[in-house]
Amino acid sequence: MSDQALSTFDRAREALDKKTRYVQDFPEKGVLFEDLTPVLGDAESFAAVVDAMAEAAEKLNAEIIGGLDARGFLLGSAVAYKLGLGVLAIRKKGKLPPPVVTQEYELEYGTAALELPSEGIDIAGKNIVLIDDVLATGGTLGAARKLIESCDGHVSGYVLAIEVPGLGGRDNLGARPVIVVRDPQ
């Protein structure tokens, strides 16, 4: 990496370290939740994280940015704008009018689904970089990859702000590059 790349990522890591709010026992006992809302709400911190994510997405040859519902929308839109690319909003089931393409995936206690419009957006053959705030189990990102592939798009990699260690999230992402702005602590 160049000196510029290191300084971009260092600024983003510093912003994440300074502004992330930690909430013990949320959403359940034993979990330390990392709330990025203060990072997103601070212009300088938000810009630092977006700059690092945009640099990573550019290295992954992004042609379209895929943002996952909901914080991935915020980060993905900003990254797409910075790079002069379009953004693909990957929605939770039931949020888009038909017709849609749906991909179900397993949750700890049930199933969920992601959707894309089946009309109006042509992603066939395009390199799509998926962006979200957190990599945990990788279930949602893995489902997003399958959804895009079912529409003949190509996921060229993943860019995340943070990663929760010990949950095996990368195992669900297939053989694609994963770039995390702040390495697991």
From Swiss-Prot:
<dbReference type="InterPro" id="IPR029057">
    <property type="entry name" value="PRTase-like"/>
</dbReference>
<keyword id="KW-0963">Cytoplasm</keyword>
<dbReference type="GO" id="GO:0003999">
    <property type="term" value="F:adenine phosphoribosyltransferase activity"/>
</dbReference>
<dbReference type="InterPro" id="IPR005764">
    <property type="entry name" value="Ade_phspho_trans"/>
</dbReference>
<comment type="similarity">
    <text>Belongs to the purine/pyrimidine phosphoribosyltransferase family.</text>
</comment>
<protein>
    <recommendedName>
        <fullName>Adenine phosphoribosyltransferase</fullName>
        <ecNumber>2.4.2.7</ecNumber>
    </recommendedName>
</protein>
<dbReference type="InterPro" id="IPR000836">
    <property type="entry name" value="PRibTrfase_dom"/>
</dbReference>
<keyword id="KW-0808">Transferase</keyword>
<dbReference type="InterPro" id="IPR050054">
    <property type="entry name" value="UPRTase/APRTase"/>
</dbReference>
<comment type="subunit">
    <text>Homodimer.</text>
</comment>
<dbReference type="GO" id="GO:0006168">
    <property type="term" value="P:adenine salvage"/>
</dbReference>
<keyword id="KW-0660">Purine salvage</keyword>
<dbReference type="GO" id="GO:0005737">
    <property type="term" value="C:cytoplasm"/>
</dbReference>
<dbReference type="GO" id="GO:0006166">
    <property type="term" value="P:purine ribonucleoside salvage"/>
</dbReference>
<dbReference type="GO" id="GO:0016208">
    <property type="term" value="F:AMP binding"/>
</dbReference>
<keyword id="KW-0328">Glycosyltransferase</keyword>
<comment type="function">
    <text>Catalyzes a salvage reaction resulting in the formation of AMP, that is energically less costly than de novo synthesis.</text>
</comment>
<dbReference type="GO" id="GO:0044209">
    <property type="term" value="P:AMP salvage"/>
</dbReference>
<dbReference type="GO" id="GO:0002055">
    <property type="term" value="F:adenine binding"/>
</dbReference>
<dbReference type="Pfam" id="PF00156">
    <property type="entry name" value="Pribosyltran"/>
</dbReference>
<comment type="pathway">
    <text>Purine metabolism; AMP biosynthesis via salvage pathway; AMP from adenine: step 1/1.</text>
</comment>
